[in-house]
Amino acid sequence: DKGPAMKYRTDNTPEPISSHVSHYGSDSSQATQSPAIKGSAVNFNSHSMTPFGGPSGMTPFGGASSSFSAVPSPYPSTLTGGGTVFVALYDYEARTTDDLSFKGGERFQIINNTEGDWWEARSIATGKTGYIPSNYVAPADSIEAEEWYFGKMGRKDAERLLLNPGNQRGIFLVRESETTKGAYSLSIRDWDEVRGDNVKHYKIRKLDNGGYYITTRAQFESLQKLVKHSREHADGLCHKLTTVCPTVKPQTQGLAKDAWEIPRESLRLEVKLGQGCFGEVWMGTWNGTTKVAIKTLKLGTMMPEAFLQEAQIMKKLRHDKLVPLYAVVSEEPIYIVTEFMTKGSLLDFLKEGEGKFLKLPQLVDMAAQIADGMAYIERMNYIHRDLRAANILVGDNLVCKIADFGLARLIEDNEYTARQGAKFPIKWTAPEAALYGRFTIKSDVWSFGILLTELVTKGRVPYPGMVNREVLEQVERGYRMPCPQGCPESLHELMKLCWKKDPDERPTFEYIQSFLEDYFTAAEPSGY
């Protein structure tokens, strides 16, 4: 719902404030490339944001832990005592003896919600008490409890969900407006002959008397009544609302209450997924109940105390496009427990998985997701330090999440710390970081440019035919990789911006995200 405020036609039927063509249609002729980068003349001001946020107030090792605070509970703490009834939004299987299992729709009284992520609750149906994940419930009869309400979700993520294969025209969701506080957006999947599958977004405005409307002609006393009416009558919308957009259950925040430093015995390593210089990655089970990914580090890879300190910061970084850190085994050998991602690393996915068959629109969308996660890391004054396709994980429906953020600076191995050693990822590293150890969010931007080449070449090693030492020398002399085969020049221009010699001349991730999200913007008919 970016764009102008709602305009009305003379017949007062609502126009969507933005509509978007499917990224996955076979006919690419309908998509026009974003005008933001044309040839070498770059107009960064075509976006309202500044492209160059220098390393303002950034510590060399990412933000200090004081810049993070525990995520507050979204509901007032006066609930302690069980006055408000909460309803389950999803099914949940207990993972420990202290948890409650429940089904979607079950009602609870909250006994204690001061912990934030896990609340002590009593099931009204069974009378049993136990802990429940707070992001699985909402106050009964609230907007949050409606299955069609998706809360804080951006326009782009709404489009990704609605355009998933198998969804039909008229499928919809309601979310918070990104641009107008207190307003909502209705996002609907549509189809027409010119554009094929696309998504229309309508702003739902709030009246001073508490009512809601999309067009002033039809006003409703609640959001629920507006949605009910729109399911029966299109009333100027592109299509009447059919079914609610399917969604996946969110990840819980952590494995369970007080399950952060966990005993090694609680983990069962089942399927080895891969291995690198510093350890292995396994699919496994925690506590006999919960599927997880487990990264095992070789002895001596990093100091347990330093790791635990960094992990405390990492677990507070929460974003849809970051792999959540669930728990740790803090004695050597260190284990890191995270969400399990079904399709493995982006590198393997591109080389050997379904990624081999992806076309440019899907690859650009994956890049946009990674930029979204990195823009969050940028906002939090953190630094990744090892951004590359091997450290991105892929889930169902081409969802991408960033893994291993912040770990690289803790590695003690001499072959790595020398920065020219065999284990150091020179080909992904900005020259000022490789030569002088100057890691900033701007060196991450350089690495992102290299990751873009991995995406468009389906996992080819950067600088083909060159060894590490050669790469360092050539890049210092001004050499940059040429435009990969089949890659549009405008995307190569973005790569070259990421590889500017002066870190402050490289764009921000905020800019990169908006550039990639709008890369295939449909040409709108005049009058929109």
Curated annotation (Swiss-Prot):
<dbReference type="InterPro" id="IPR001245">
    <property type="entry name" value="Ser-Thr/Tyr_kinase_cat_dom"/>
</dbReference>
<dbReference type="InterPro" id="IPR008266">
    <property type="entry name" value="Tyr_kinase_AS"/>
</dbReference>
<keyword id="KW-0597">Phosphoprotein</keyword>
<keyword id="KW-0067">ATP-binding</keyword>
<feature type="active site" description="Proton acceptor">
    <location>
        <position position="386"/>
    </location>
</feature>
<keyword id="KW-0728">SH3 domain</keyword>
<dbReference type="InterPro" id="IPR000980">
    <property type="entry name" value="SH2"/>
</dbReference>
<comment type="similarity">
    <text>Belongs to the protein kinase superfamily. Tyr protein kinase family. SRC subfamily.</text>
</comment>
<feature type="compositionally biased region" description="Low complexity">
    <location>
        <begin position="18"/>
        <end position="29"/>
    </location>
</feature>
<dbReference type="InterPro" id="IPR050198">
    <property type="entry name" value="Non-receptor_tyrosine_kinases"/>
</dbReference>
<feature type="region of interest" description="Disordered">
    <location>
        <begin position="1"/>
        <end position="35"/>
    </location>
</feature>
<feature type="modified residue" description="Phosphotyrosine; by autocatalysis">
    <location>
        <position position="416"/>
    </location>
</feature>
<dbReference type="InterPro" id="IPR035751">
    <property type="entry name" value="Yes_SH3"/>
</dbReference>
<keyword id="KW-0829">Tyrosine-protein kinase</keyword>
<dbReference type="InterPro" id="IPR036860">
    <property type="entry name" value="SH2_dom_sf"/>
</dbReference>
<dbReference type="Pfam" id="PF00017">
    <property type="entry name" value="SH2"/>
</dbReference>
<feature type="binding site">
    <location>
        <position position="295"/>
    </location>
    <ligand>
        <name>ATP</name>
    </ligand>
</feature>
<dbReference type="InterPro" id="IPR017441">
    <property type="entry name" value="Protein_kinase_ATP_BS"/>
</dbReference>
<dbReference type="InterPro" id="IPR036028">
    <property type="entry name" value="SH3-like_dom_sf"/>
</dbReference>
<dbReference type="GO" id="GO:0005524">
    <property type="term" value="F:ATP binding"/>
</dbReference>
<keyword id="KW-0727">SH2 domain</keyword>
<feature type="binding site">
    <location>
        <begin position="273"/>
        <end position="281"/>
    </location>
    <ligand>
        <name>ATP</name>
    </ligand>
</feature>
<dbReference type="InterPro" id="IPR001452">
    <property type="entry name" value="SH3_domain"/>
</dbReference>
<keyword id="KW-0547">Nucleotide-binding</keyword>
<dbReference type="InterPro" id="IPR000719">
    <property type="entry name" value="Prot_kinase_dom"/>
</dbReference>
<dbReference type="Pfam" id="PF07714">
    <property type="entry name" value="PK_Tyr_Ser-Thr"/>
</dbReference>
<keyword id="KW-0418">Kinase</keyword>
<feature type="domain" description="SH2">
    <location>
        <begin position="148"/>
        <end position="245"/>
    </location>
</feature>
<feature type="domain" description="Protein kinase">
    <location>
        <begin position="267"/>
        <end position="520"/>
    </location>
</feature>
<keyword id="KW-0808">Transferase</keyword>
<feature type="compositionally biased region" description="Basic and acidic residues">
    <location>
        <begin position="1"/>
        <end position="12"/>
    </location>
</feature>
<dbReference type="Pfam" id="PF00018">
    <property type="entry name" value="SH3_1"/>
</dbReference>
<dbReference type="GO" id="GO:0004715">
    <property type="term" value="F:non-membrane spanning protein tyrosine kinase activity"/>
</dbReference>
<feature type="domain" description="SH3">
    <location>
        <begin position="81"/>
        <end position="142"/>
    </location>
</feature>
<protein>
    <recommendedName>
        <fullName>Tyrosine-protein kinase transforming protein Yes</fullName>
        <ecNumber>2.7.10.2</ecNumber>
    </recommendedName>
</protein>
<dbReference type="InterPro" id="IPR011009">
    <property type="entry name" value="Kinase-like_dom_sf"/>
</dbReference>
<dbReference type="InterPro" id="IPR020635">
    <property type="entry name" value="Tyr_kinase_cat_dom"/>
</dbReference>
<keyword id="KW-0553">Oncogene</keyword>
